[in-house]
Each structure stands twice: as C-alpha cells, then as structure tokens.
Amino acid sequence: MSSSDSLADAELPDINDRLVEPDTPYEIWDGEVVYVSPAHPPHGQRQRQLCALIDAHTGPEFQSAADLLTRTSRIDDIAPDVSVYPAAPNPATGGRQLEHLAFEIVSKQSLRRAGRKAAKLAGRGVRRVFAIDIKRSRALEWSAEAGAWRELDPAGHIEDPALAVPLPIASLIHDARPDDAVARALLAKRNPVLMQERAEGHAESRAEGRAEA
C-alpha cells in the first residue's frame, strides 16, 4: 500500500462511527438524510431468504447481518440489505471489521441507485458487492473498474474466501423457500447435528439388516 493510500485510510472515519441513529429508518447519502421505507413483501421475503442462505454458506470465521450501517466516507452512512464480515473484532479498534461481501436487493429502487451504493461500499474497501434484481430474476456483481453491474450466470456459483461452501446463484434469484440450498450447504459444511443424524440412520440401517439376516 502506498503512503498516499495509508493517508487516505487514516483520514476516513471508522466504519462504526455513526452519522445516523442505529435502528432508525434512515441513511446518510452525500451528507443528506435519506428515509428508507419499510420493505414490501417481495423485498422483505427475498431479504429473509437471502439471510438464511448467507448464514448457511458462511463459516465460523464470518458473521452475517441485515441492514448493518457502514460509514463509507465523511458524508455517507449506508446499510446494505445483507453484509458478511469477519467474526473477530478489528484488532486496532475493537469494533466490527469492514464487510467483505455486501448484497443489495433491487425491487422498488432502481439498479442505478443500487449502483451508487455499491460504488460507495467498494470505495470504502468492501471486496465484492452483489445485487439481486427481483423483477428480472437475475443476480449481478459490481465492477469497480468498469463502474457498472455485471450479470452473473444463473447456473453458476459465488465462490469466495468468506464463504465456507460455494453459493448457488440460482438460489438467490428464484422466489422459493431456501430449504434445499440451506440443507445442501449444511451437509457440505458437515454440520454436526446433520452428521450425527446421518450416522444414527446408518447405524439403524445396519441393525435392521442384521436382524433380517
């Protein structure tokens, strides 16, 4: 990192320094207070599904949260719909570390406005920002280099060090209960409860086989 980059980081406020009161329906965009209206069913339902999916696909080293405020600049304090960030606190400040992944659901707001938020998050250092476009049933990733959204292959997966197992893109864009995708992720992570259930099932099958012999 160059000395100019270090100076720029030092001049930024901590990500946990608030411009707005937490747990209120407001964000700060370019120094102006912006009211964020409560979600309607399509947005709220997809956000709930997304939270379940992200929780299932992250490992113990990361946490996920909904509507988590992040101070991206001196004049911006904004909250992605879902954030994925390190579970360990920042060793320098003791506060939360910057998220590695951010997800924004596009329903009532425009993709252009979601792009403005993505640019602010990426400018602060968030590694990857995604958008779930409900109306067009597609997922996109923000390209800081191009300053635009890039559509993702619906048959593909999101692979990232913040994820314990790859996240299927189809599960993000289809309006369906995420149970199957969550179950597959937990099996891939060798969830202890599921592993115990599987072992007990195998033991019962072997016992039944011996009894029938």
What are these regions (language model features)?
Residues 213:
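Phosphoinositide-driven peripheral membrane association surfaces
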